[in-house]
Swiss-Prot record:
UniProt enzyme class: hydrolase
TM annotation in the entry: none
Keywords carried by this UniProt record: Allosteric enzyme, Cytoplasm, Hydrolase, Metal-binding, Protease, Sodium, Threonine protease
Record-given protein name: ATP-dependent protease subunit HslV
Length: 178
């Protein structure tokens, strides 16, 4: 059976502000199944942003588990991510999930990979998904050469990724913490 795939999620942190955004396209093979999916959300009393890429059902399963870890560790983003990664590596069912997450709170941004790794991105910029490389390159160039806000950088990066990646559209959801 073919997998649902393709999206772009990008996060930019600058100073005391962070923005996390994603497109809305869900693709099954070469068919666009939905154009307005919401892959970026606020969780834990609106204090944590999370964006997901990969298999849709897998991503929702990981998101649910991450939220449970966040509750268990009273909003400690790093601890919740590390605990989820431990489970991911040791649980046979979790190891089969094909998804990635970007999480961010007021102080920290983390990427949780499909291998169960937790990465702290360099320079406060990270992106995942099929258009992630385009978005990350654009975000990095904009961050280094402009005074745009994180939200503006995320918006422009997603626009560029949507122009270049066939699995990324121009329906964007962007959340910020300031």
């Amino acid at each position: 059976m073919e997998q649902f795939h393709g999206t772009t999620i990008v996060s930019v942190r600058r100073g005391d502000k962070v923005a996390l955004g994603g497109d809305g396209q869900v693709t099954l093979g070469n068919i666009v199944m939905k154009g307005g999916a919401r892959k970026v959300r606020r969780i834990y009393n609106n204090q944590v942003l999370v964006g997901f890429a990969g298999g849709t059902a897998d991503a929702f399963s990981l998101l649910d588990r991450f939220e449970a870890k966040l509750e268990k560790h009273q909003g400690n983003l790093t601890r919740a991510a590390v605990e989820l990664a431990k489970d991911w590596r040791t649980d046979r069912m979790l190891r089969r999930l094909e998804a990635m997450l970007i999480t961010a709170d007021a102080n920290t941004t983390l990427v949780i990979t499909g291998n169960g790794d937790v990465l702290d991105p360099e320079g406060g910029i990270c992106a995942i998904g099929s258009g992630g490389a385009y978005a990350q390159a654009a975000a990095r160039a904009l961050a280094e050469n402009t005074e745009l806000s994180p939200r503006e950088i995320v918006e422009k990066s997603l626009e560029i990724a949507g122009d270049m990646c066939i699995y990324t559209n121009h329906n964007r959801v962007i959340e910020t913490i300031e």
